A protein has these predicted regions:
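Class I SAM-dependent methyltransferase SAM/SAH-binding core
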Residues: 56, 62-108
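A conserved beta-strand element that flanks and buttresses the S-adenosyl-L-methionine
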Residues: 120
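Acceptor-substrate binding/catalytic loop of class I
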Residues: 166-182
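Conserved beta-strand signature within the Rossmann-like core of class I S-adenosyl-L-methionine
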Residues: 147-154
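N-terminal, positively charged/glycine-rich alpha-helical extensions of SAM-dependent methyltransferases
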Residues: 1-21
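A C-terminal cap/extension of S-adenosyl-L-methionine-dependent methyltransferases
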Residues: 149, 185, 195-232
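A short glycine-rich, Lys/Arg-flanked "PGG" loop and its adjoining helix->strand segment in the class I
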Residues: 134-146
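Conserved alpha-helix/loop element of class I SAM-dependent methyltransferases that forms part
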Residues: 32-51, 68
């Protein structure tokens, strides 16, 4: 999906997303918070105290992650970058300062080398042509500090409910889902090290009493989503 396609859906992004995930019984905010909880845990384990640290939300769009980033990283600074100017305008109107919202051309990130402590992308790369992944992962790596980390969250194409949901989603029309192993290979080929996979999001709301098990199921390739976590 290009910038104009994202712009087209920007105003109704949340309502479309909510309708699309109705079978889960959850809201877009539930999934956004889920990801930020994972990021908090990973950062605490690998980087420790990141008070005053700088984080990059690659493909941050309308800013869905922002309130939950602020909840789990109250002393850190977040920059949301996206190709969709319209989405960024909505993010600014909703959340504004101290979060930064920055447009980029889809080619080169407008930041100096070693700017950020950590970068994350929440279900973004399946919208990007596979041939562009290496270049953009390289850009993310370039703007990370030498000790930087990256978390790439994606939909799991091995989960049939995920595939059905993506196929029915208007803004996923041109999506190409990525297997976890393939994404890890691309991340490591871009220069990141020690990339590891964890499968996530196993139980819909009617089965929420089972969610306490999810942290022990990261090895099982049937979660609705997964992340790859790597170091520069």
């Amino acid at each position: 999906m290009n910038a104009s396609e994202f712009d087209k859906f920007a105003e109704e992004y949340r309502s479309l997303h909510q309708a699309n995930i109705a079978a889960s019984g959850e809201t877009p905010e539930y999934f956004a918070e889920y990801k930020m909880k994972d990021l908090r845990r990973l950062v605490s384990t690998d980087l420790g105290n990141v008070d005053g640290g700088r984080f990059l939300d690659f493909g941050g769009g309308v800013g869905t992650s922002v309130p939950f980033f602020r909840k789990f990283f109250p002393s850190a600074h977040l920059t949301c970058v996206d190709v969709s100017v319209k989405s960024l305008e909505i993010g600014i109107a909703r959340f504004g300062s101290p979060t930064s919202f920055v447009a980029f051309d889809g080619d080169q990130l407008p930041f100096a080398e070693s700017t950020f402590d950590c970068a994350f992308a929440a279900c973004v790369f399946h919208h990007i042509p596979p041939e562009a992944h290496a270049r953009l992962l390289g850009e993310i790596r370039r703007v990370l500090k030498p000790t930087g980390r990256v978390m790439i969250y994606e939909h799991n194409p091995l989960n049939p409910l995920t595939v059905r949901t993506v196929n029915a989603c208007p803004f996923d029309e041109n999506a190409i889902l990525i297997r976890a192993g393939a994404l890890r290979t691309r991340i490591e080929s871009s220069g990141f090290r020690e990339a590891r996979i964890r499968y996530r999001v196993f139980f819909p709301r009617p089965l929420r009493w089972l969610r306490g098990m999810e942290d022990n199921l990261g090895w099982l390739p049937m979660g609705a989503q997964y992340y790859v976590w790597g170091r520069k």
